[in-house]
């Protein structure tokens, strides 16, 4: 019996030991156990880094407290079309951490729908009516009182910025995050009292053949490695007062639906986007701020560009002074060791790409109020090189009649000339000085966006009134020579001060802010502060004659004639003096392209008077409207003047590249086949193709005049008042200028250019006649003019080339007119707004 008992005890002992071990393993570990030996980063959300395991633990104690979660991209891919640039902001959310048993959920609030009321039940009704988004679920690893510890490694090692999606959408291939080649990036992982910053190196592995953009910029295109950044930031306190949007002033806004609004008022609320700025002395007309707005310029910017960025951005100090703040806006160089991704720093980043691209001004904004938390400017280093390219194409600084055709170049701007160099040159003929003037303006422009200001594309028509316009270089003609000394304005303009005053003026305590703002805006409107933004300037069929990109002057038509004169002078002197010694002559083409198309944007401005409409973003006031002029059709005489100026650009002598210049444009030199140069397309490769170049230039005018919306407006305005030109008149003038005006008989080359333009006109007419999106009346008029062109293509006794061209064109028109009809489908009428009081989009059962 004793032996049996002993045996039983021996058999049970291992089982008991294993059970105890299992209980020990399953027992939750404490904070101390999990964090022992780990690197702690104490801050807003404390972090614990396990270097051996490559893990990052996140301590959460701020439950049910809203924080800002912001994603960004510290390192880019380097291709402008991809849109994955260094310093780029990604998605931002207001989130809260919610404990749910063994999990912690990160939940994004939905501030697009809210109720501005003290009634908690009313607020809750709105919150529960619209979905929230759970961004992540964390497993609780340890809990101690009100704080928990979660393993956040997976959260931070994910593609939060959507890089793989962007690569796929850009047709660069299928990429997936490769965890084996991804890791936390601890040099940029930090914790501060009001924000916690985490960065990760992520590698995306490609499947199949990578796209061209990736192949051009990534050393091993199957492996795209970037870094993504995560910020958890304390939201601002409740001492900020939102300010309403006024459509007459171009300030961005956050828009939301307020379901606590009275039922007889609109749901939509719009609060402008701006930094918080308060006077130290509210009673003073001009006061120091409680806390200034400080921007930091990327230390990686070379001189003299760095100083130009500081100077240009600093112009905004004058606007804030006009709004009652002294020393409220400052620009500094980012201190050594400071993290540009830290939300405490408003940044002006200097970004490199393989090709030139847009600059951006964006902001981290509190979606609850519109308050700017961090401004982020992205400036492309290729932009200044493009400005230099334009300038050295206009002016032969590397040797001309004034300096001697073989003179040694003073500067190649890519070498970044210093101030001593700039002092030696005549500013009237110095592209480098012009380029730096442009980069100052660009710095001010993009910084203006981060201060809350939208584009104002009308400001160039009343005295260079805003850096928020897109300025073309103002090239003046003095004594028959081109003068670049006044190419770009210095400082912010009158409209900029007006907009900053609206956004930032602090009114005395007890003042009626709404009335004060209305007065401020009314005064600005009476002073001529016209604001017209992107949606009314960018479309090809835009109607407002004064809302234009890259234009100059109060009269777009006169400015077009001026730019054509500038182009003629520059073409007459274009040659060896436009490139430095030792440069292959084939490189001249990259400078010739912007010169040949120098007039393109001013042409786009002038053509808007044809079928054009002046209008404002007027609002109703006690006395009527402000501005008083709501809209007006462009006078008939003005429309015809603009049409004539636009058609003048189609003259053969304007389109034909001078033979002297053609002789200087050989095929690409050996070793220079690639690169970032932008060149004309060719049907004569490798030789330069002047006929295609002429077609490209002519199409600027032809396509603009045949734009379907412009054509429909012409017909509508003529129906209202027959004194206005109708679309048929415009087409008749276009056909007369291109088909019924003989080319100069001096050269077959000119006749070839004219034939190319004639073919273009017929092609664009056929495109319009077949455009299902164009109105039926517009298509009918286009078709009628195609029929009329059959007479212009009838056989004549002209030269053989002309006869072949006419015969081919006639046959092309006949084939088009006789084309088989497509299967008839019911043409839906333009959609009417929902009429049922219960809404639209779903049918009730």
Functional labels for PLM-detected ranges:
Residues 1-4:
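Positively charged n-region of N-terminal signal peptides that target proteins for export
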Residues 6-15:
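Bacterial N-terminal signal peptides
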Residues 23-301, 319, 333-430, 439, ...:
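Auxiliary tRNA-acceptor-end handling modules of aminoacyl-tRNA synthetases
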Residues 65, 300-328:
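Zn2+-dependent metallopeptidase catalytic core
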Residues 88, 299, 303-311, 433-442, ...:
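Soluble non-cytosolic domains of exported or imported proteins
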Residues 314-325, 353, 448-449, 453, ...:
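Sec-exported extracytoplasmic/periplasmic mature domains
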Residues 333-352, 437-492:
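The catalytic-center signature of Zn2+-dependent metalloproteases
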Residues 429-430, 460-845:
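Conserved catalytic/binding loops enriched for acidic/polar residues
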């Amino acid at each position: 019996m004793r032996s049996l008992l002993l045996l039983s005890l021996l058999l049970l002992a291992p089982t008991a030991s294993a059970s105890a071990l299992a209980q020990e393993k399953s027992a939750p570990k404490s904070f101390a156990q999990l964090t022992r030996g780990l690197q702690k980063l104490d801050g807003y959300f404390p972090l614990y880094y396990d270097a051996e395991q490559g893990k990052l633990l996140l301590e959460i104690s701020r439950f049910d407290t809203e924080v800002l979660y912001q994603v960004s991209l510290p390192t880019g891919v380097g291709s402008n079309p991809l849109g994955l640039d260094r310093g780029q902001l990604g998605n931002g959310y207001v989130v809260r951490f919610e404990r749910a048993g063994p999990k912690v959920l990160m939940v994004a609030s939905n501030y697009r729908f809210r109720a501005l009321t003290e009634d908690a039940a009313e607020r809750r009704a709105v919150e529960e009516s619209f979905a929230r988004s759970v961004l992540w679920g964390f497993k609780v690893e340890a809990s101690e009182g009100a704080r928990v510890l979660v393993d956040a490694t997976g959260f931070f090692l994910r593609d939060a910025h959507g890089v793989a999606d962007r690569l796929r959408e850009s047709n660069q291939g299928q990429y997936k995050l490769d965890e084996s080649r991804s890791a936390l990036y601890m040099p940029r992982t930090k914790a501060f009292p009001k924000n916690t910053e985490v960065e990760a190196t992520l590698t995306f592995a490609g499947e199949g053949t990578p796209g061209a953009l990736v192949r051009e910029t990534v050393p091993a295109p199957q492996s795209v490695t970037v870094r993504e950044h995560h910020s958890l930031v304390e939201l601002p306190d409740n001492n900020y007062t939102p300010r309403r949007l006024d459509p007459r002033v171009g300030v961005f806004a956050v828009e939301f639906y307020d379901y606590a609004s009275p039922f007889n008022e609109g749901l939509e609320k719009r609060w402008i986007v701006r930094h918080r700025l308060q006077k130290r002395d509210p009673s003073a007309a001009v006061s120091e701020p409680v806390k200034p707005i400080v921007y930091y310029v990327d230390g990686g910017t070379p001189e003299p560009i760095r100083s130009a960025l500081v100077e240009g951005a600093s112009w905004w100090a004058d606007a804030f002074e006009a709004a009652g703040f002294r020393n409220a806006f400052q620009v500094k160089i980012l201190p050594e060791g400071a993290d540009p991704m830290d939300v405490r720093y408003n940044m002006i980043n200097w970004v490199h790409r393989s090709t030139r691209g847009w600059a951006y001004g964006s902001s981290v904004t509190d979606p609850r109020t519109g308050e700017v938390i961090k401004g982020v400017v992205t400036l492309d280093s290729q932009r200044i090189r493009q400005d230099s390219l334009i300038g050295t194409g206009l002016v032969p600084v590397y040797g001309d009649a004034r300096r001697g055709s073989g003179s040694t170049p003073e500067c190649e701007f890519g070498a970044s000339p210093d101030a001593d160099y700039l002092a030696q040159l005549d500013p009237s003929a110095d592209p480098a000085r012009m380029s730096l003037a442009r980069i100052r303006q660009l710095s001010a422009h993009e910084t203006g966006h981060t201060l809350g200001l939208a584009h104002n594309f009308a400001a160039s028509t009343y005295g260079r009134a805003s850096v928020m316009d897109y300025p073309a270089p103002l090239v003046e003609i003095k004594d028959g020579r081109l003068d670049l000394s006044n190419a770009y304005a210095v400082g912010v303009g009158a409209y900029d001060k007006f907009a900053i005053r609206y956004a930032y003026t602090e009114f005395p305590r007890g003042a009626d802010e709404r009335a004060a703002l209305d007065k401020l805006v009314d005064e600005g409107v009476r002073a001529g502060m016209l604001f017209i933004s992107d949606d009314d300037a960018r479309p090809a069929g835009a109607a407002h004659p004064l809302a234009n990109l890259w234009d100059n002057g109060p009269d777009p038509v006169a400015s077009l004639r001026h730019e054509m004169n500038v182009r003629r002078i520059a073409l007459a002197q274009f040659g060896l003096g436009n490139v430095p010694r030792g440069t292959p002559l084939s490189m001249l083409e990259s400078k010739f392209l912007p010169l040949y198309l120098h007039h393109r944007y001013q042409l786009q401005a002038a053509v808007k008077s044809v079928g054009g409409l002046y209008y404002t973003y007027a609002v109703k006031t006690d006395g009527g409207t402000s501005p008083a002029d709501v809209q007006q059709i462009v006078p008939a005489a003005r429309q015809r003047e603009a049409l004539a100026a636009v058609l003048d650009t189609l003259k053969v002598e304007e389109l034909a590249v001078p033979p002297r210049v053609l002789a200087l444009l050989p095929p690409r030199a050996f070793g220079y086949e690639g690169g970032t140069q932008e060149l004309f397309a060719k049907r004569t490769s490798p030789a330069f193709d002047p006929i295609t170049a002429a077609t490209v230039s002519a199409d600027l005018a032809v396509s603009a005049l045949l734009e379907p919306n412009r054509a429909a407006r012409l017909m509508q305005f003529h129906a209202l008042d027959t004194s206005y030109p109708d679309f048929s008149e415009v087409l008749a003038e276009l056909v007369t200028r291109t088909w019924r005006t003989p080319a100069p008989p001096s050269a077959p080359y000119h006749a070839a250019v004219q034939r190319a333009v004639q073919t273009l006109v017929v092609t664009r007419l056929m495109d319009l006649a077949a455009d299902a999106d164009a109105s039926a009346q517009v298509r009918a008029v286009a078709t009628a003019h195609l029929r009329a062109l059959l007479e212009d293509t009838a056989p004549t006794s002209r030269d053989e080339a002309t006869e072949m061209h006419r015969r081919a064109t006639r046959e092309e028109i006949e084939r088009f007119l006789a084309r088989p009809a497509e299967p008839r489908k019911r043409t839906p009428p333009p959609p009417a707004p929902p009429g049922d009081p219960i809404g639209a989009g779903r049918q009730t059962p």
